[in-house]
Amino acid sequence: MLTVALTAASVMPMTVYAQPAFASGGEVKVVEGDVNGEMQGGVMSPGAMAIEGSDLKVNGNVSGGLVSDGSTVTVNGNVTGNGIDTVIAKKGTVTVNGTVTATDLSEKTGVLASNGSNLTVGDTEVGGKESTGVIAESGSKATAGNVKVSGEYMTGTSAYGDSTVHVKGNVTADGNGMTGVSVHDGDKSSLIVDGDVTATGENSVGIYGETGIIKIGGDVSGREAVITKGKADVTVGGSVSGTLVGIVAGGNAAVSVKGDAGTKTGAGMFAQENATVTVDGNVTGGTFYGELEDFEDVYPAIIAGTGATVIVKGTVSTAEGNGVAVGINCKDIGSQKGTLIIEKAKAGGEASAIYVDTIPGVSQEYILNSLPDIVVGELAAKNENFIWNSYDNDLYQNNPEDETIGELNEKIYAAIRYMIRWNNSEGGSFSVDGTSKYGEYDVAQENQELGITIQIAEGYELESISGGKAQVLQRPDGTWSVIVPRGGGVNLSAVLRRIIKEEMKNSRVSNPGASGSEEQTTVQKSSGYVEFQKAVRSQIKNAAPGAVLEVDGKNWMSFDRSTMEELSKRNDLTVVVRFRYLGKRWRVVVPDGYAVQTLLNQEGYSGFLYLSAVFGAVPEEA
């Protein structure tokens, strides 16, 4: 006979259960059905509670919250609470395979992991005031689905004391004085949100970071979208959008935004003290808060202190009106020399691209020495008034008295480093003499002459060379040169034409819309040709950024105007076209960044043979 000895730690299954579920003394208990909290001795006990190393499982819903103190609690259902800390793990492990709903909280927490706990819940919704949806503290880890809080002065989720919070969905905070996510203490604290962080209402903040690491996979929005200080390290995988300000970074904080950053009113970015802010996309400023609609001045897109590091890989621009792209605040002095690296700074209206707000009572030499290193690709402003400053003898009583605003402008111009850019290709490569390196950038300064040599590959010939905003001059020895203009914009490019076989050079198809097996004298807009163009346009629209797009021309011999217009919107794409001609398969490559609409003929077509003449065609096996 088989005998089984039962101990106090054995599994104790229960049936339909409405009263609180409780486990203690190391017991293992399984409760089938819903459980509710109840008043015991004038105190509301939670719906589920495990202490003293116990293991409690509830296969149902829990009303009245749950507590794990040094124990394990699993709920295969939903958890609700009213006016209480609804899910609490203290030195324990909690798993809720359902939702958590907490209502009418006041200075409470919907989900709390503390003292080294490990807590996992599903979607969490919390309402009330001065409360938080999900908190991890004192070395704990909390994982949740979507987190939504509503009410007044609520926070979606927070991490304290070297703890980790991971939200696998979105964080939404809706109400007055709301904060989406925050990290307050613990250099090793981390807060990760896979989706978006959205804070709406008056005085709302999307991200507030004082230390630790914050990583957001999607977009961040709020009245003030991102506020950081201390040693906070923030990464946003999407874009940042504020209604009052996009980013405020101070202390030694670091903020990295993979998309754009901007605001409706105020500055798109404040970079203060020793902060570092990197934006891979564009930065835009807004209007002045509360001004009349016809007020012509707008806020600078960026305001940076002299010790901050700002890197923008896109364009910095303002709202419509008179607005400075970048304002440098010389009164905001960090403990280090700052850096300002911007692809393009574009002023609004009558303003300058860069404005330097100087310090009263100091010399121009002092101001110049305090400025950050300025590295730009291009400055854009009306009438080429790219730089302006507030240096005014009468107002600031600067010394010496004979120094003027205009003189300081010229000294700032002389200190700017301009990015010098060029693209090499299969047909040839540039060699540029006279540049220097600033980090990853090749740079030169105003009025500096640069020597240019092009190494042309065998089978190619040079058709033309351009310097962007710089004029290219040919030297007697066959090389070229450019002089860096004020405002930069030096972008070297060359059109290299492949010398193709005689059979291609001498061949001609009079109908760009005809198939490769038949020449016609009139354009046949057949349904097959129309469908081919439609399919190519769809490829272009859906291509990943920077992709190499493979187009099978089948038996067609051209692109129409609509297709080329669509391609002109995607100058990041390289297009490889394969087509059949004279019994052979050919391949022609249209490089990224090319002005493709110039390849259209008068009838609005771009024939593959013409593309071959411009870019060169390579035969392939039939």
Language model segments and positions:
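Bacterial Sec-dependent N-terminal signal peptides
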Residues: 1-5
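Sec-dependent signal peptide cleavage junction
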Residues: 10-25
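Extracellular/surface-exposed low-complexity segments
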Residues: 19-23, 314-316, 322, 330, ...
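Surface-exposed loop/turn motifs in large extracellular/passenger domains
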Residues: 22-37, 46-61, 66-83, 87-131, ...
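Glycine-rich repeat segments that build the extracellular carbohydrate-interaction surface of secreted
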Residues: 29-31, 51, 60, 451-454, ...
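Extracellular modular ligand-binding repeats in secreted and cell-surface proteins
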Residues: 367, 372-374, 431-461, 486-488
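Surface-exposed interfaces of beta-sheet-rich extracellular modules
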Residues: 372-391, 395, 448-480
